């Protein structure tokens, strides 16, 4: 990590670097013992012990999450920083020393690294507690990966952001060059709706399709027709993606199935666009059902809303990143992206700033998030700590 001159309030560079070996070991311990959403009891206990040893009084929030205040009741604004705790229901394929000991559970999105970063921030803030000009609230959030609607929504409902002026979160991203920060005002990530489509026809023998109403044929037509929802429904402006990702029907080779099922997603960056897409999608489904004489049922699981940055918060992140890493390392390229994030609920409740820290190693095909070979790059730990601390200094200087 390269720092530029201009660090104010405190200059934690040496302290950060000295802390990295301990945080690396801690991160790999979390990686070795992954836990799914709302099951992060071991991770929660680890974070609680770390925080209590440094003078915090963490309180449980959202079952397996924690909220910890640096200076409860201090005058001035409260700045919140968030890390997600949970793993993915995936198998670890790597042979790294700290690979997962739990089959079907693995940290393949880097939340172990995010947690280590925020614990490092907690350490540095605690060392300088008396000179921090306000309260910093640390959010250790469970269940970002979509279990029961996500942990961020629960944390908001349980008051984790009460009295908070602004909230910030980061995510490692192997798709961006290592050492870059990607951030913008407005939409960062998409609203995501999950679709389940059930087609009911009339089954029968494969030799007599004329006596059947084949849900597989109707479904094949529907998959193709749905690709026109955006291209012909929204035109060149687009702004949405409709993807059918699962299609199942039948049990054997000589029977026309009674039912077929499809699953997929609708993603967009504006609520109004999502509404138009869903209207057109229902029209296409109704037309397909009528054309093929089948019944088609649509279930929609409304997922996370658009993750949108407040202009003031996005500017603060960009300003701090430019100061610490250089202006050439700050970019809006490839944003917004069509993934979803429950940080959206935090940024709906109070002004928020969400940003990506690149981890793509030069000359390497770095595994992306959710790939079975992914592992968090520990060299991002000091970068993340420095950025979070810089944001805290910047926000107190402006808002204080």
Language-model-derived ranges and their functions:
Residues 217-400:
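Metal-dependent amide/peptide-bond hydrolase catalytic core
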Residues 8, 15, 19-26, 39-50, ...:
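General structural feature for long, well-ordered alpha-helical segments within catalytic domains
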Residues 6-107, 112, 116-133, 137:
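Acidic/His- and Gly-rich active-site-bordering loop/insert found
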Residues 30, 68, 81, 111, ...:
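Divalent metal-coordination and catalytic microenvironments
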Residues 80-82, 91, 195-197, 354-360:
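Non-cysteine beta-strand/loop elements that form the S-adenosyl-L-methionine
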Residues 88-90, 94-106, 112-113, 128-257, ...:
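Histidine/acidic-residue-rich, glycine-tolerant segments that coordinate divalent metal ions
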